[in-house]
Amino acid sequence: MPNSKTNIKAYTRQELRDTIAALGEPAYRADQIHRWLFSDWVTDFEKMKNISASLREELSRRYVIPSCSFENEAIEERSVSAPETSKFLVGLHDDEMVETVLIPSPDRHTVCVSSQVGCPLRCTFCATGYMGFTRNLLASEIVEQVLLVNERLGDRSPDNHVTNMVFMGMGEPLLNLNNVFDAIETLTNQSYNFSLSRKRITISTVGLIPQIGELARSGLSIKLAISLHAADQEKRTSLIPVAKEHTLEELRHALHEYADMVKEPVTLVYMLIEGVNDADQDAINLIRFAQGFLCKINLIDYNCIVNVKFNPVKAEKRDRFIHTLVNAGVHVTVRKSQGASIDAACGQLALQKKNKTASRPY
């Protein structure tokens, strides 16, 4: 028989306040409950010791406290001196799953979180897009990806914790803005047991212009990364079908406004794909796109996925592309892909442990 109780973690923070107020409780009571759920990570109302016994009983009657869990972990084999990337299969309360990636380095621990189960945008180079879309993640499910990774890091060393977070996992975060905003508010609450600063959080998007404006107006001042991959309209649309909804000039204008508002450079992510976007003219187009606003370019190699006939560029072609950008005075970083051997690199997340391997749906 299905459980008729409501998942209390499905509420945003404001919804929780409204719900607790409807029970005749003061507003601060909801904040106490929220702290128990997300800072102390309790799974039993009886452990909420500063909540009255009568309210604990009422909450137990109405609600459940589900938690996400690790279903599987894959660790990339690397040299002893290099930290290994780990990919976690995270089970959700309704038996759906997402993937979360931990990318360690000597001075930080970056967690790459998912924001949706699957993705509706069908980017042609991305395994997640071939899965199709199931649903948005709750704010709690985003937060718990960080909690789970923190727990795993603590097992390895008591002083370890997540220092940076990127919304670059499964899904398009700007299609789930309310839950993404709520998760960020929780994770950056300085009175909670996290050590995350908003300045260490990056949201990656394919470039949904109305939502970029909403993010700019939110006051969160989060760093923004754009999956650009081509500065030619036709080429970009062939890689990112939703790009047909707005011109590159409209996107550029939105990014210019965002950078001006948050006083942070926008990162233009450009994945080099052999014979697709690696020509001299492609480099020139990218230079032109990047002119006139605060931005930097991250070049990354294409990471191969099942049933997709793209290939990474050869080293000589990549070096020529980089040389063209540098000679034009463009700020460019060549980002080394981590996690490719365990299908945890950019574009490779596709729930393979759940037998949802990438296959073309169209």
Curated annotation (Swiss-Prot):
One of its GO terms (cellular component) is cytoplasm. The keyword Transmembrane does not apply. [4Fe-4S] cluster binds at C119, C123, C126. Coiled coil: none annotated. The active site is at E99, C346. InterPro entries: Aldolase_TIM, Methyltransferase_A, RlmN_N, RNA_MTrfase_RlmN, rRNA_lsu_MTrfase_RlmN/Cfr, rSAM. Keywords: 4Fe-4S, Cytoplasm, Disulfide bond, Iron, Iron-sulfur, Metal-binding, Methyltransferase, rRNA processing, S-adenosyl-L-methionine, Transferase, tRNA processing. Its cofactor is [4Fe-4S] cluster. PROSITE patterns: RADICAL_SAM. It comes from the Bacteria. Binds 1 [4Fe-4S] cluster. The cluster is coordinated with 3 cysteines and an exchangeable S-adenosyl-L-methionine. SUPFAM superfamilies: Radical SAM enzymes. It is found in: Cytoplasm. Its EC number is 2.1.1.192. GO terms for molecular function: 4 iron, 4 sulfur cluster binding; metal ion binding; rRNA (adenine(2503)-C2-)-methyltransferase activity; rRNA binding; tRNA (adenine(37)-C2)-methyltransferase activity; tRNA binding. It catalyses: adenosine(2503) in 23S rRNA + 2 reduced [2Fe-2S]-[ferredoxin] + 2 S-adenosyl-L-methionine = 2-methyladenosine(2503) in 23S rRNA + 5'-deoxyadenosine + L-methionine + 2 oxidized [2Fe-2S]-[ferredoxin] + S-adenosyl-L-homocysteine; adenosine(37) in tRNA + 2 reduced [2Fe-2S]-[ferredoxin] + 2 S-adenosyl-L-methionine = 2-methyladenosine(37) in tRNA + 5'-deoxyadenosine + L-methionine + 2 oxidized [2Fe-2S]-[ferredoxin] + S-adenosyl-L-homocysteine. GO terms for biological process: rRNA base methylation; tRNA methylation. Residues 105-341 form the Radical SAM core domain. HAMAP family: RNA_methyltr_RlmN. Specifically methylates position 2 of adenine 2503 in 23S rRNA and position 2 of adenine 37 in tRNAs. Belongs to the radical SAM superfamily. RlmN family. This is Probable dual-specificity RNA methyltransferase RlmN. The gene is rlmN.
